Amino acid sequence: MATAVPPKTICSSHLPRTSILTRRNSTSNAHIPTLPSPLKSLTLTPRRSLLTPLFAAADTEADLASFGSTTTFHGFCYVVGNNIDTDQIIPAEHLTLVPSKPDEYRKLGSLAFVGLPTASYPVPFVNPGENSSRFSVIIGGDNFGCGSSREHAPVAIGASGARVVVAESYARIFFRNCVATGEVYPVETEEVGIWKECSTGDIVTVDLVGNHLINHTKGKDYKLKPIGDAGPVIEAGGIFAYARKTGMISSTAA
Amino acid sequence: MAASPLTATGSAIFSKKCELGGSISSSSPSLVAHRCRKHSLNKILAVMAPSRTPQRPPSTTGSVKHAMTMTEKILARASERSQLEPGENVWVNVDVLMTHDVCGPGTIGIFKREFGENAKVWDREKIVIIPDHYIFTSDERANRNVDILRDFCLEQNIKYFYDIKDLGNFKANPDYKGVCHVALAQEGHCRPGEVLLGTDSHTCNAGAFGQFSSGIGNTDAGFVMGTGKLLLKVPPTLRFILDGEMPSYLLAKDLILQIIGEITVAGATYKSMEFLGSTVESLSMEERMTLCNMVVEAGGKNGVVPADKTTFKYLEDKTSVEYQPVYSDENARFIQDYKFDVSKLEPLVAKPHSPDNRALARECKDVKIDRVYIGSCTGGKTEDFMAAAKVFLASGKKVKVPTFLVPATQKVWVDLYGLPVAGSGGKTCSQIFEEAGCDTPTSPSCGACLGGPRDTYARMNEPQVCVSTTNRNFHGRMGHKDGQIYLASPYTAAASALTGFVTDPREFLQ
């Protein structure tokens, strides 16, 4: 029975990944044997399943049990600095897009991080003309998501296909919006300055059970703070989905 | 096989406490210490003072056995608890929910998706819907969003919807107000002791009335819309004691820029900021709003000013709803005190691209500017324009750069054309602005504070340098990604307009 609940790999639940990314990621298998040993006992199996069917859709049922199951993300990282405000994540001119409308949701994904200054960020997070990003993990510094309360910000990141941000700390409203929408896991690092050691395009794994971030390209391993009670809410798909799943509110709308 | 230890580990991790959002807001508040910038402002110091008991009226909420701050008390009452501690998560009854044209349609979408197409809002009199962001634009989606609000308000019979239909002439829309935070105050929706949530980060503006007010996202707002409640984490409180006579060349904007420069843009994350002291007591309601408006720029969850006779006077003709102010107990626990001698402060700016990038205005006198913008919830109120007019009047000169004036609300616009400016022999702001060569005050809205659609009035479409009375100077905030924004008080903005450089207003006010 132990195998009945396979460790869950969440990639993008919203958008199909490009085949390029899948290929690139499977080549990164080669890095795995160099992982530090203490983690092996915990995560060996999930890591295998994580890497092989990398962006195969996550098992859609089994989710109730999956509160305790693995949540792991793997792929290219996109690295930003301190105080990334929500105007840079999604500039205000695009706030006419309504996230609850599916086509506009997708459009928001294509615009994620379009407000970053080009001089400092020559590589776009989403290539022009595409709807989704080839980066699956965002790595940032202090106070990520500060500024405007626009929920469009975590939605744009989630809609782009990225599901996890790893930063030193978060602005309050952004963190809460990540959890409420279930769009993005906002994970905190134990140490500061990781973003300075990582480069956009590095291949990384974020393991929310072992609470660490592995930079395979650089051969480094960093501790993360546990996501805690927010994890199951995000995994369920946000506060409403979580509340239904756990019986806090009735399962169907009137 | 290997999955079983995993599952076990996992369940151990997650079985601790799985209530909804148990830690939604529990991400570490750990971020403050390591960002202290070195400022060249040695003269202006925030000194951490030993806890001092300000003279305050006793608690009005009965038992004082468990000392609480204002914010704790408001949340205790709203959650029907006799006492609570910072860090607790409580279900709070919301008094007013505000949304606007940028986040309203998404909130409505979530409300309908989750509660059903035919669901009714929890209380049609407690939801205030204010189109204000993208109004005077030909952007079809922006216009559609206002239509979505209108349809919803009709369907739900929402009592307070400040509609606009005739975009060609805002004055033809008697219901239209303009910038939500200022409209909330002017229309009597801000009341001491209450809980106000809004889908806008500057909802904290209403803390000026001694109430709890904070910004939330669409999903949370959709939840409130259906239930009237929200799970909130009780924040600990930082106390800011501002004493001393306010120099004639300073405004509340200087005070809040001083504070944000001191504690950084993350210095109050997850925390409440309470402002008191003799200077705060001397501030008008609009100035108190400026102070509270920008607490989110320090990461604050909310800001509060204790209600007093200034508050009650302001509310006299604005609301008939009974309210009950609350005050921090004498022995309430504040996690930190900051004390400022306001009489020693000087006019400030926040340099690009962060609101905590503080500098003295006079230190930036060599910064050449291309334009000045006076407007927004932070700096577009009647008194903000009065202050700018005072500088123009004192100088008797003309502006050297384009100067854009965007009144926050229709009421402010009327004031610009109707109220005489002190010492001007009866001239109005609009006359003074015209004589100084400013652009004619435009239709009230959020305008270019946040850039907005391309055809937004005064949007920064070129990489220019702007002195602005708004609240954020992030990359791209007012339009162009490479634009540079210096945040300043209306005095400093007007003085800068007159010289074409960032300018200390004492050059004209003394």
Model-derived features with residue positions:
Chain B
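Fe-S-dependent hydro-lyases/dehydratases of central metabolism
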Residues: 2-510
